[in-house]
Amino acid sequence: MVLFGVLTMILAIALFSLRIPAIYFNRITIILLLFSALLSYNSLYMNNIGSGVGVFGGLFQVTTITQSIDVFIYLLGALVLLLSEKANRANTLSFNKLNSTLVNKSKGLSVLAEYPLIALFSVLGMSSLISSSDLISMFLSIELQSFAVYILATIYRESESATSAGLKYFLLGSLSSALILLGSSLLYSFTGLTSFEGLYMLCSTTETNTAIEISVLLIMVGLLFKVSAAPFHNWAPDVYDGVPTVVTTWLTTMPKIAFLVFILEFQGFTQLANWSSWTNLLLISSLLSLLIGTIGGLAQYRIKRLLTYSTISHVGFLLLALAINNEESVESFLFYLIQYSLTNINVFFILVAFGYLLGSKGLSIYSPIQLINQLKGQFKVNPLLGLSLAICLFSMAGIPPLVGFFGKQMVLYAATHNGNFFLAFVAILVSVVSAAYYLRIIKVIHFDPVPAPSALSLIKTTEISSDLNVTETNNSLEGSSEELSTSSSLVIATITLLLIFFIINPTPLLNSVHLITLNLFYW
């Protein structure tokens, strides 16, 4: 369905982009993703899907977990695309027929007609990746979604910081793809096989070969690079901070889901979890991610860089669950991935909402909220948004009874039950330390006074002018703020309520991840 949508959108944009406002393409894409989610959900009731259904000559294998994650990816993709719809009223928008964009007269923002198309390409690559059962389909899927996110990072060509960040993303992402391709080539040269099933049979019947181990570890290093796990994380803070906030929302959430689920399936298909070298690599990366993500975040004063280091820390929890690879850990991995993805998206929804409230006082037309100090006193401006952000940050910190606490508790229980007491202790320690920078944001929002216009001007001329990553500043401090759209308000309210009231009825989500885990291990 997504492939059909991609082909249809290519034709529609080519033929009708000069006559149809670009925002309509965005809404059509959202409807398409929702319908794709419905189709994937219905496919879960097929009789043979539990054991896996091979398609395209075995290049892809459709299973319960692939279809379940497809539903999640499609729904999240539809939510993120809502952010690209401007919160302006209809009379403040005009259609520019020269470049097929919908232009906001007050600030020069635009909704690109190509944005939803590229997002669809990215979703298609993610869906293909988690269903891959062959080295060839794996690499093609990785490149399909990678090229899409490279373009997304640089799609706003007026932004110099986004162009710089996108170039860095492309160059270093190409390096990780080269490592994956090198590992795949070596693996094929040593085994003569590309299918995961064939590799599983070979590894089960023969002794472990050092050359094969090196090949697989090269693939794993490339995948860890893609999810910005330490020590392969250095590109992430600059890239996520440089691109527009709307694009950052996509980059920090969507690709990571696909890559992490693929790692889970890859080690399940090939029984790599039984290799000590594979497990040790995951454990070392998990430990470094926990430490670097926490310590690095303490020194940040830019909100998106801080959230990037927070993401690195959470990736450490996910890698810890992957390294253990038993029923408890896989269940905790899926639960943690779902709850963190929802929380992270909600945080960026709220940041975009605060950017609307700032209006022309924002530091950039693409990323109005860049500094933590810009959020001073925003609780007094909009108490509900301030409270929602506090709830999300408390959940990320693992404060009970929010859903983030149960995610960390499940991972730590699996780690201690498997004998990884040291890593469990480190995870508890970094959770306590990371609460410091979450509480710093909450303190700025709720207890600091609203800065005067002169203070905002000082921020512009001193802090921002010295930062090479920010060049699209909005020089006007006067002007009205924009209104938050009803759809964005509904998304923020719904996710926030889910974080709060999960404890009242946790059965649906817990049962779902439990059934997926049982299917993965016992079908």
From Swiss-Prot:
Reactions it catalyzes: a ubiquinone + NADH + 5 H(+)(in) = a ubiquinol + NAD(+) + 4 H(+)(out)
Keywords for this protein: Electron transport, Membrane, Mitochondrion, Mitochondrion inner membrane, NAD, Respiratory chain, Translocase, Transmembrane, Transmembrane helix, Transport, Ubiquinone
Protein name: NADH-ubiquinone oxidoreductase chain 2
Transmembrane segments: 3-23, 30-50, 62-82, 110-130, 135-155, 170-190, 212-232, 246-266, 281-301, 306-326, 333-353, 386-406, 419-439, 490-510
Source species, domain of life: Eukaryota
InterPro entries in the record: NADH-Q_OxRdtase_suN/2 (IPR010096), ND/Mrp_TM (IPR001750)
Family: Belongs to the complex I subunit 2 family.
This protein's GO CC annotations: mitochondrial inner membrane
EC assignment: 7.1.1.2
Broadest EC class assigned to this enzyme: translocase
Topology versus the membrane: Multi-pass membrane protein
Gene Ontology molecular functions: NADH dehydrogenase (ubiquinone) activity
Purpose of the protein: Core subunit of the mitochondrial membrane respiratory chain NADH dehydrogenase (Complex I) that is believed to belong to the minimal assembly required for catalysis. Complex I functions in the transfer of electrons from NADH to the respiratory chain. The immediate electron acceptor for the enzyme is believed to be ubiquinone.
Biological processes, Gene Ontology terms: ATP synthesis coupled electron transport
Keyword Mitochondrion (UniProt): yes
Protein location: Mitochondrion inner membrane
